[in-house]
UniProtKB/Swiss-Prot annotation:
Lineage: Eukaryota, Viridiplantae, Streptophyta, Embryophyta, Tracheophyta
Protein name as annotated: Subtilisin-like protease SBT2.1
InterPro entries tied to this protein: Peptidase_S8/S53_dom, Peptidase_S8/S53_dom_sf, Peptidase_S8_Asp-AS, Peptidase_S8_Ser-AS, Peptidase_S8_subtilisin-rel, Peptidases_S8_3, S8pro/Inhibitor_I9, S8pro/Inhibitor_I9_sf
PROSITE patterns for this protein: SUBTILASE, SUBTILASE_ASP, SUBTILASE_SER
Superkingdom field: Eukaryota
Length: 832
């Protein structure tokens, strides 16, 4: 196989919290003689030999020991085949096998030369050779905002039972096992380890014996690819499941952290925290590291192990930073491994990405993956400063206030003798106390400039606070510099009175007042002080009731790209949206993921990384109530019950720009929010579900033009074994997307009644047609009993030639209170 025949793509995976930036791509293989390759074989992996999905699988809690034994025996056989192949082809040459993948995909990763990779690729039993690719790192109130205490939790017996018996696997940066959010001794209700979980707790110097318990029931780390490249420093990068970054600890706590854990930050008590499913079990698969991120070979190994261990749900707060090349975005090693995970009955949740708000910015592609975008919620921490002229200026900042008025001093007016602005060009940011004269600052409120360097992480609020404390200032106030205008500010913790004024207009009002009160030396006109005074009110108490939810500007948007040429897929993404802005979660005190919360045990983070675990936790509640639900059934329950309105009953809005996002917003479409905003209580009683299985996904993949050899590469299955193919719009999804409607198209949907009562329910069908499209649904009325399935015919006809996307909804309204919501999107319309 020549070089052009190798599947060569490199794309970053980002931990999608909005404070982290992705690194640029690089092709390391141009400068080294060997590299890590991912090799897949034609034969099928272990999970494909079960021939079962969900309810009969290991993940149903009913798997027999003989089933597990057969799976393990098959896995051992696959590993022997891998070793034999390497010995036979490479003989006594130098190579290093890193992993055998045997459960979800049949293959291995190894350090090879290009010639060795070519020789393996030429073997009949080998289907694919892919270069490893780089991966990189991208609540106290949300349970109440989502209605869990009086809704979904009550249905499960309260917070002490919510998520009981469900295992969530997190592919992330690890976990801090000492955090009380993961203790198994919080309540008197004893945890019991689910018998279907067979994972282990790795013991290292950084993760000593006793780190795991009956809550945190498994922990491993994966770094063979990183080690082979020499980029892993065992001491600096925590070569253990311990979280030295903070991100993994945060996401795990949002989904499944214990209920009622006190949140204390910068010495301030800020309420109590809880995960969405506080009784769910946690299994950690660390594959990303604080200094360099990680590599796909390690990510795939983590996913493969999580599935083999028996997790019920996988949370992925990572996404590629660009579309995978090839005939379709769905064909990449991670998504294809996750397809096998779905076959094993595992529900997979992935963050949409933080590349919004532009259209087609979606970073999660495949229909078997549940993709979550980010919204705001209704809690804010309001702060303000009262000036001596009786003007009150609002701002943000988790800080106490000053009880009395204090004089103000601008940073550039408090320099030491001999120090000038030219000597320290960034002195206005207050990053170095040695630049200032303490006598000029002591007992006053120090006024500093908040520039774009803070947004980039070059300067930090924490360092400015240290400066203010070293100078014994009475408080600290930031005004917004023009370079940072338009960026959305969050409430940073401050251990002295402080405030960040985020409005340019209010910042100018502060400076005008200060400058109007300047004191100058007679004769020289030199500034010797200011008569201006102010009082910081403080921002420790949250306020509620703002318009929420709204889709955040950073949340990636649809339509879902089918390939890297901007062709749109007939798949709706995101699936729905959930809280992802200013989310409190557990944090590792050693974490370096955010400057503002270093050394703290909780942090407030934003990003679709935070949205995904909200849905992961709610999915655990559904899995607890319906243990035999397929992944598609869980996805359907979440989607069809989603809310379309904000707390005021108005249509959910979506921010449209990065700068000044609250000024530029409009009603959210399905390409912004999918089915809508997650409704935890309704999702536990959806009435009807749209189910779909592995075979349907395979028929869909086989229907993509030119896909047969690629499908064989990844699954070991031939498209010829499937009697038919399915267009994407024909998948039995709880949504309809038609990228190009030429004339008329009819699609079918199957709904199954899973109501807990045996009584029949009669549904009336209603719809709102997209612009320039006519819609007809039949039957328009039907009665369905428990466990029964009905087929719905949906016919769409283009009325005009229009190239702009338009949206509609189909609703199924049951006489027992169930409402099933089906979003519709049609992009190109060509009337015939």
């Amino acid at each position: 196989m020549d070089e052009s025949s190798l599947v060569r793509f490199v794309f970053l995976l980002c931990l999608v919290s909005s404070s982290v930036f992705c690194l640029a791509e690089s092709d390391q293989n141009a400068t080294v003689s060997s590299a890590v390759y991912i090799v897949t074989l034609k034969d099928r992996p272990s999970v494909h030999f079960s021939g079962r999905e969900s309810s009969d699988s290991k993940h149903s809690l009913t798997a027999t020991s003989s089933q597990i034994y057969r799976t393990l025996n098959r896995s051992a056989s696959i590993i022997r085949v891998h070793d034999s192949l390497l010995r036979n082809v490479l003989r006594k040459e130098n190579y290093l096998k890193l992993y055998s993948y045997h459960y979800l995909i049949n293959g291995f990763s190894a350090v090879l030369t290009r010639k060795q990779a070519d020789r393996l690729a030429a073997r009949e039993e080998v289907e694919n050779v892919v270069l490893d690719f780089l991966v990189e790192k991208a609540t106290t109130h949300t349970p109440q905002f989502l209605g869990l205490p009086r809704g979904a939790w009550l249905r499960d017996g309260g917070s002490e039972y919510a998520g009981e018996g469900v295992v969530i696997g997190f592919i992330d940066t690890g976990i801090d096992p000492t955090h009380p959010s993961f203790s198994d001794k919080i309540s008197g209700h004893t945890y019991s380890v689910p018998p279907h979980f067979t994972g282990v707790c790795e013991v290292t110097i950084g993760f000593p014996p006793g780190s795991c318990n009956r809550k945190l029931i498994g922990a491993r780390h994966f770094a063979e690819s990183a080690l082979s490249r020499g980029v892993l420093n065992s001491s600096q990068d925590d070569a253990s499941p311990f979280d030295g970054e903070g991100h993994g600890t945060h996401t795990a706590s949002v989904a499944a952290g214990n209920h009622g854990i006190p949140v204390v930050v910068a010495g301030h008590r800020l309420g109590n925290a809880s995960g969405m499913a506080p009784r769910a079990h946690i299994a950690i698969y660390k594959a990303l590291y604080k200094r360099f991120g990680g590599f796909a070979a390690d990510i795939i190994a983590a996913i493969d192990q999580a599935a083999q261990d028996g997790v019920d749900i996988i949370n992925l707060s990572i996404t590629p930073n660009r579309r995978p090349p090839g005939i379709a975005t769905f064909f990449n090693p991670i998504d294809m491994a996750l397809l096998s995970a779905v076959k094993a009955g595992i529900f997979v949740v992935q963050a949409a990405g933080n590349t919004g708000p532009a259209p087609k910015s979606m970073s999660s592609f495949s229909p078997w993956i549940f993709t979550v975008g980010a919204t705001s919620h209704d809690r804010v921490y309001s702060n303000s400063i009262i000036l001596g002229n009786n003007v009150t200026i609002p701002g943000v900042g988790l800080a106490s206030g000053t009880r009395i008025m204090h004089k103000l001093v601008l940073a550039t007016h408090a320099l030491r003798n001999g120090t000038t602005v030219m000597d320290a060009i960034y002195v206005g940011e207050c990053q170095d106390s040695s630049s200032f004269d303490q006598k000029l600052v002591q007992g006053k409120i120090l006024v500093c400039s908040y520039t774009v360097r803070f947004i980039l992480g070059v300067s930090t609020i924490k360092q400015a606070l240290l400066t203010a404390k070293n100078l014994t200032a009475a408080g600290l106030v930031f005004y917004i510099d023009p370079s940072a205008t338009g960026f959305q500010m969050t409430s940073s913790p401050m251990d002295i009175p402080g405030i960040l004024i985020s409005s340019p207009q209010d910042s100018q009002a502060l400076l005008r007042y200060y400058n109007s009160s300047l004191l100058r030396e007679n004769g020289s006109g030199k500034i010797v002080g200011s008569a201006s005074v102010a009082k910081i009110v403080g921002g420790m108490r949250p306020t509620y009731g703002i318009t929420a939810p709204k889709v955040m500007y950073f949340s990636a948007r649809g339509p879902d790209p089918e390939d890297d040429s901007f062709v749109d897929a007939d798949i709706m993404k995101p699936n729905l949206v959930a809280p992802g802005n200013a989310i409190w979660g557990a944090w590792s005190p050693l974490g370096i993921g955010t400057n503002d919360f270093q050394g703290e045990r909780f942090a407030m983070e934003s990003g679709t990384s935070m949205s995904a675990p909200h849905v992961t936790g709610i999915a655990a509640l559904i899995k607890q109530k319906f243990p035999h639900f397929t992944p598609a059934a869980i996805a359907s329950a979440l989607s069809t019950t989603a809310s379309l309105s904000d707390r005021k009953g108005e249509h959910i809005m979506a921010q449209r720009t990065v700068l000044n996002p609250d000024i530029s917003q409009s009603p959210a479409t399905p390409f912004d929010m999918g089915s809508g905003f997650v409704n935890a209580t309704a999702a536990l009683d959806p009435g009807l579900i749209f189910d779909i299985g592995y075979n349907e996904y395979m028929k869909f993949l086989c229907g993509i033009n030119g896909s047969s050899p690629v499908v064989l590469n990844y699954t070991g299955e031939s498209c010829s074994s499937y009697n038919s193919s399915l267009a994407a719009s024909d998948l039995n999804l709880p949504s309809v997307t038609i990228a190009k409607l030429v004339g008329t198209r009819a699609v079918l949907r199957w709904v199954t009644n899973i109501a807990t009562t045996a009584t029949n329910e009669t549904y009336i069908v209603g719809w709102m047609a997209p612009d320039s499209v006519s819609v007809k649904v039949s039957p328009a009325k039907f009665t369905i009993g428990n466990g029964q399935t009905r087929v719905l015919s949906l016919v769409f006809r283009a009325m005009k030639n229009v190239s702009m996307a338009s949206f509609g909804r189909i609703g199924l309204f049951g006489d027992r209170g169930h409402v099933v919501n089906i979003p519709v999107a049609v992009i190109y319309k060509i009337a015939v």
